[in-house]
């Protein structure tokens, strides 16, 4: 039996004491300082306060608010477009209904008052009666249909749990889509703030080649499934592009991931406190 297959499997102390029960693509790629600040500090305190609040502790409400981390409009928009596009591609809903639902979700977003950037982007994204969102959904659907040509059904949000040699906890993730022998990952691009534009925004173009972090992410899924053709779909409000990733690129990405995980695990093993880890970091505050 797998060392990770039982819910009772013991998490090593050097992981458990830092609030890390598994790796994810985000945890692997993010800067070390962010990993500790987010997963070892903020999240455990937020969920502890939330549980206390649900159990009737009124004072915990302040802690919930303090440690909460509101999602950005770009994050919410990406999720909404993913869901809408796969629903359309699988024939489960119409384009108009999917767009309507995505917009209704995004219109509920209330940016944090301190997050001026998110306020500006939210106003821009929703200022044209949803046309930017609608056209991004259209481009994403076209990209999905191109990537999964011949698939009768695309399975979405499949959970993967991957074990790697020498790594004490598994990698857990969720695919965007899989069908007809293809593993597909969707990446949406949203207008970016630009001081050189009359509108204050510029189109965020789709990349001419697949980006390294995206290759590393989809390589995890291929490894977990034991094979498959990997394609990354990039879409914005104007265009889309589908990049098929070579096996050489995937293998190299997996090798680099294993190197990164071994480094991070050694840091966890050889430090006693979070302060010890933080002392190893050169913090770039733009990561936060």
For each of these PLM feature ranges, what is it?
Residues 58-64, 188-190, 233-240:
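Short acidic (Asp/Glu) and glycine-rich catalytic loops that position anionic groups and cofactors
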Residues 83, 87, 91, 190-192, ...:
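Short loop/turn segments at secondary-structure transitions that flank enzyme active sites
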Residues 155, 178-186, 229-234:
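A structural signal for short, well-ordered beta-strand segments and their strand-loop junctions
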Residues 75, 160-217:
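Non-catalytic protein-protein interaction segments used by genome-maintenance enzymes to assemble
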Residues 1-174:
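Metal-dependent nuclease catalytic cores that hydrolyze phosphodiester bonds in DNA/RNA
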Residues 37, 89, 192-195, 224:
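Active-site-proximal flexible loops/turns
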Residues 208-215, 220-288:
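Metal-dependent nuclease catalytic regions and adjoining charged, substrate-binding loops involved
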């Amino acid at each position: 039996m797998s060392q990770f297959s039982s819910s009772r499997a013991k998490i090593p102390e050097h992981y458990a004491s830092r609030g890390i029960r598994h790796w994810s693509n985000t945890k692997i790629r993010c800067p070390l300082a962010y990993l500790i600040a987010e997963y070892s500090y903020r999240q455990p305190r937020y969920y502890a306060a939330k549980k206390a609040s649900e159990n009737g502790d009124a004072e915990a409400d302040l802690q919930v608010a303090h440690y909460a981390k509101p999602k950005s409009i770009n994050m919410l928009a990406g999720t909404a477009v993913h869901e809408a596009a796969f629903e359309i591609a699988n024939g489960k809903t119409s384009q108009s209904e999917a767009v309507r639902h995505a917009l209704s979700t995004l219109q509920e977003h209330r940016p944090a008052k301190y997050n001026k950037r998110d306020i500006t982007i939210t106003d821009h994204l929703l200022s044209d009666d949803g046309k930017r969102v609608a056209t991004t959904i259209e481009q994403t659907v076209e990209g999905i249909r191109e990537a999964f040509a011949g698939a009768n059904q695309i399975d979405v949000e499949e959970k993967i749990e991957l074990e790697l040699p020498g790594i004490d906890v598994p990698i857990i993730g969720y695919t965007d889509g899989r069908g007809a022998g293809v593993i597909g990952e969707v990446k949406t691009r949203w207008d970016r703030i630009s001081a050189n534009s009359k509108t204050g925004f510029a189109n965020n173009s789709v990349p001419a080649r697949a980006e390294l972090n995206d290759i590393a992410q989809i390589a995890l899924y291929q490894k977990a499934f034991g094979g498959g053709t990997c394609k990354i779909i990039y879409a914005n409000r104007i265009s889309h592009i589908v990049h098929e990733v070579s096996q050489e690129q995937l293998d190299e990405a997996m090798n680099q991931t294993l190197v990164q995980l071994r480094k991070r695990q050694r840091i966890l093993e050889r430090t006693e406190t979070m302060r010890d880890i933080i002392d190893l970091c050169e913090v770039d505050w733009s990561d936060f």
